[in-house]
A protein has these predicted regions:
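Extracellular beta-strand-rich solenoid/capping regions of secreted or surface-exposed proteins
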Residues: 83-91, 106-172, 181-199, 205, ...
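Acidic glycine-/aspartate-rich tracts in secreted/extracellular proteins
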Residues: 79, 101-104, 178-179, 371
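Extracellular beta-rich repeat passengers
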Residues: 324-447
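Acidic Gly/Asp/Thr-rich repetitive segments characteristic of extracellular carbohydrate-active
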Residues: 52-97
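Secretory targeting and sorting signals
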Residues: 1-38
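Cleaved targeting-peptide boundary
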Residues: 39-45
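Right-handed parallel beta-helix
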Residues: 169-179, 194-207, 228, 234-251, ...
Length: 447
């Protein structure tokens, strides 16, 4: 079996004691923060609440709240989204309202583009690529090079030019309620910018037409794809809230196998890398995905950064990286993890702490099906830490680190060098979280 690859202050919100969904579920104990219009602030001008995770640190996260009418856009096509985003270097505050689902794989006229369209004129063909780099003849000691690899890279670059949307600083991107708002087949790239809000969007089917074969990745090689649904690279003050991330409708079980390895067309769902910092990820729904959230792109990423809060999210049908954390100070609280296999996505682990990551995981709730092993909920390389208490497995308080360490030679440490203080909405008990979060997470909830 191959070894897994590891590459890769206007702030007011109404605090609701119980949402309508929770009341309907008969739950009355939990107090939690949920976005709503407050003091006349509409959905598009809402900003991150004080003390709501790391993104509230310092100047906080306000996105495009100060946008004027000339920089407030409603978009429903790829071309309109590109125009609304403008230049990645333009820091003028802007609000972008996404109405309906935008297909990133379309041209400026709205014509659907296929993988064949991107490959056209590059000289790339999958059959030629497979023949050229077959390990039986090419070997396994070096990366692909030569004409077909250059052609693959050229085709991939054509797709990237079309589906990667570069988000400038001081931007709010929000799905219009009631329109099934989202982006399919595309990637929001938030790179080297500050102060971005992404809310109420469904990100689906982010697919790379041209994965690269790497025979040196792991024991048996791997096919690696290039696009995350949302990618933070050197970004600061980012708030991702009430979004849904899914591979649907193309699940990994439909992927073919070449050279004995899955031809993986999906990469991350929401990756936080290249020294990104001060990020809050809350009330999102992650489902039907393999490598879901990477915090830190390598063991040598920037130290003193990668401070991330992850709370009140639902993770179901997730194989791994929920998240995989390196180096930073990461607070994971009040999340719901369901490790039931869904649509072929069989969980390997939930949280991986490696490269001296300082993780505090507390008051989260895991549902583990019959036969599942608590020892496999965590993972690590022997240098990372996971502190925290109040985590439940099937309703029972469980010491996740003790369970993992008892079964692994690479022990997870239990002490960290920091104490979370930005914890708005924290619930000491995880007991009622599955019922509470069932109807209050993901896209389509905000009004």
């Amino acid at each position: 079996m191959a070894a897994p690859s590891h590459r890769r202050s206007l702030r007011k919100r109404r605090t609701l004691a119980v949402s309508a969904a929770v009341v309907a579920a008969g739950v009355g104990a939990g107090v939690f923060v949920m976005s709503a219009n407050a003091d006349g602030v509409d959905l598009y001008h809402q900003t991150l609440a004080a003390k709501d995770g790391w993104a509230a640190s310092g100047t906080g996260t306000t996105g495009g709240a100060k946008a004027d009418s000339a920089h407030t856009f409603t978009v429903s096509t790829r071309a309109q989204l590109v125009k609304a985003l403008g230049s990645a270097s333009d820091t003028t505050p802007r609000i972008i309202k996404v109405k309906g689902t935008i297909d990133a794989n379309t041209d400026d006229s709205g014509r659907k583009l296929t993988c064949a369209d991107y490959a056209s004129g590059t000289g790339y063909s999958l059959s030629a690529y497979l023949k050229t780099y077959d390990p039986a003849t090419y070997g396994r000691s070096k990366l692909p090079s030569g004409a077909q690899e250059k052609a693959r890279a050229a085709a991939q670059a054509k797709q990237a030019k079309n589906i990667v949307f570069k988000v400038p600083a001081n931007t709010t991107i929000v799905g219009v309620p009631g329109t099934d708002a989202g982006i399919t087949g595309g990637m929001l790239q938030i790179q080297n910018v500050d102060n971005v809000i992404v809310r109420n969007l469904t990100f689906s089917a982010t697919e790379d037409c041209f994965p690269q074969w790497d025979p040196t990745d792991g024991d048996d090689g791997n096919w690696n794809s290039n696009y995350d649904s949302v990618s933070l690279r050197g970004a600061t003050h980012v708030w991702a809230d009430h979004n849904t991330f899914t591979d649907a409708p193309h699940f990994d079980k439909a992927n073919p196998t070449y050279f004995g390895r899955e031809y993986q067309i999906h990469d991350g769902a929401l990756d936080i890398t290249k020294g990104s910092d001060l990020v809050t990820v809350e009330r999102n729904r992650f489902t039907d995905h393999d490598k879901t959230m990477l915090i830190g792109s390598s063991d040598k990423d920037s130290t003193g950064k990668l401070r991330v809060s992850i709370h009140h999210n639902v993770w179901k049908g997730i194989v791994q990286r929920a998240p995989l954390a390196r180096l930073g100070q990461i607070h994971i609280y009040n999340n719901v993890y369901d490790t039931t296999t869904v649509n072929g996505y069989a969980p390997q682990y939930s949280i991986n702490s490696r490269a001296k990551a300082q993780v505090v995981a507390e008051a989260n709730h895991w549902t583990v099906p019959s036969g599942g092993k608590v020892a496999k909920l965590l993972s690590g390389d022997g240098t990372g830490s996971v502190a925290g208490s109040g985590n439940l497995v099937n309703g029972t308080v469980t010491d996740l680190v003790a369970a993992y360490n008892a079964a692994s030679s690479k022990k997870i440490r239990t002490t960290v060098n920091w104490t979370p203080t930005l914890t708005a909405g924290f619930q000491a008990s995880a007991k009622n979280l599955p019922a509470e979060l069932a109807g209050t997470t993901g896209a389509g909830v905000l009004k």
